[in-house]
């Protein structure tokens, strides 16, 4: 008997990061010393007090039962308190927060929950590749808006055709930005809220890197903008702020109608989040030790960015001056595409980077560097690349 994938699965886009990992693994299997700067996987451990909270709760038999479908109230109250303290946003813990096993789940399921086949979704180019999974699964259409260096990789809302804006159901934004490291300003968010109200477009803010700012920069939340909850929601993941990428914990916050739709689809797909994981999440959000740890984490990324960018500048390779995330967005040398340049680096000097084309056509003139190894290895990576004499060195 033969079983065939459904048409829905066949229509899914290629998993960009899976292909990247396969290339790196193949080179490592050959015995190469690969410096892997191609992924966005935090290399630092989860903070001790969070792990301890998980272990303590996991030993409690009450944690072994089914959790509340829509998240335990103490966790949602902790999320609301976190947003109030850090962003000045008031949230109703029951009506304006949705708990989920990672922000990717919510970002992918939103088109299924709030859009109909054929509805239009606006996406950034370059942008997080997995946004397209939601497009395919929801059978919606999409158009992109370019993020350019000339506009500091922020959307030019005035350049979106009026006819497109009026047809659009939702727009996704992501700041600090993956892959560019650009950040959004309060003025931009104010303009975005006004634009969304004018054209009746829902806003979906992906705040995955919200706590990560270089040289003390504090990223604003979209929800802190007056009127933001009238038009949208924001996803907050524990992966980057608390080094919990493998734990799979996140929440969405904001507009109560959008939150209700996400809760409803999750009622049918999942049976809550492991209670001990939620207790660990509470420790992450509320324990003062987290603030100290995040400050140290930002200092670590500061030193790494400085080491890489300064070494790259010495060989004539100039970085976009990112202010958030843990990435460097680097131009490819003349005569190369992002893929051909990335393939050259992996093959010739065993340095893995992420081709910008994987984030959209507008990214093809760049590669993304993950600052997720020690400064010495970052400098070594630049020194290896320097031996190819592709820049003015």
Where would I find each of the regions flagged by the language model?
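A short helix->loop->beta-strand "cap" motif at the edges of active sites that frequently abuts
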Residues: 119, 140, 198-201, 229-230
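N-terminal small-domain helix-loop-helix segment of the aminotransferase-like
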Residues: 2-101, 109, 284-287, 391-393
């Amino acid at each position: 008997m033969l079983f065939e994938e459904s048409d829905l699965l066949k229509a899914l886009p290629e998993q960009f990061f899976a292909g990247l990992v396969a290339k790196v693994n193949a080179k490592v299997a050959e015995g190469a010393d690969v410096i892997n700067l191609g992924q966005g996987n935090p290399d630092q451990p989860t903070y001790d007090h969070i792990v301890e909270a998980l272990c303590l709760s996991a030993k409690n038999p009450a944690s072994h039962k089914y959790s509340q479908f829509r998240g335990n109230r103490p966790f949602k109250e902790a999320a609301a308190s976190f947003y109030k303290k850090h962003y000045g946003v008031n949230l109703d813990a029951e009506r304006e927060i949705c708990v989920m096993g990672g922000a990717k789940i919510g970002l992918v399921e939103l088109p299924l929950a709030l859009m109909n086949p054929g509805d239009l979704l606006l996406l950034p180019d370059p942008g997080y590749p997995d946004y397209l999974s939601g497009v395919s699964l929801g059978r919606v259409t999409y158009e992109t808006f370019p993020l350019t260096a000339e506009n500091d990789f922020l959307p030019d809302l005035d350049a979106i055709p009026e006819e497109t804006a009026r047809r659009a159901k939702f727009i996704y934004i992501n700041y600090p930005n993956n892959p560019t490291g650009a950040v959004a300003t309060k003025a931009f968010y104010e303009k975005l809220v006004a634009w969304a109200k004018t054209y009746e477009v829902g806003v979906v803010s992906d705040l995955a890197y919200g706590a990560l700012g270089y040289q003390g920069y504090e990223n604003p939340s979209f929800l802190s903008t007056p009127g933001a909850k009238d038009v949208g929601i924001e996803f907050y993941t524990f992966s980057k702020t608390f080094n919990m990428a493998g734990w799979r914990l996140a929440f969405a916050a904001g507009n109560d109608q959008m939150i209700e739709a996400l809760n409803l689809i999750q009622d049918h797909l999942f049976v809550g989040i492991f209670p001990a994981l939620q207790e660990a999440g509470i420790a992450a959000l509320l324990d003062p030790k987290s603030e100290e740890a995040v400050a140290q984490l930002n200092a670590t990324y500061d030193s790494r960015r400085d080491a890489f960018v300064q070494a790259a500048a010495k060989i004539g390779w100039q970085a976009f001056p990112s202010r958030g995330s843990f990435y460097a967005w680097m131009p490819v040398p003349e005569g190369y595409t992002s893929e051909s340049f990335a393939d050259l680096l992996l093959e010739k000097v065993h340095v893995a980077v992420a081709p910008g084309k994987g984030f959209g056509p507008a990214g093809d003139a760049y590669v993304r560097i993950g600052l997720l190894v020690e400064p010495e290895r970052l400098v070594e990576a630049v020194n290896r690349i320097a031996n190819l004499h592709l820049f003015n060195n």
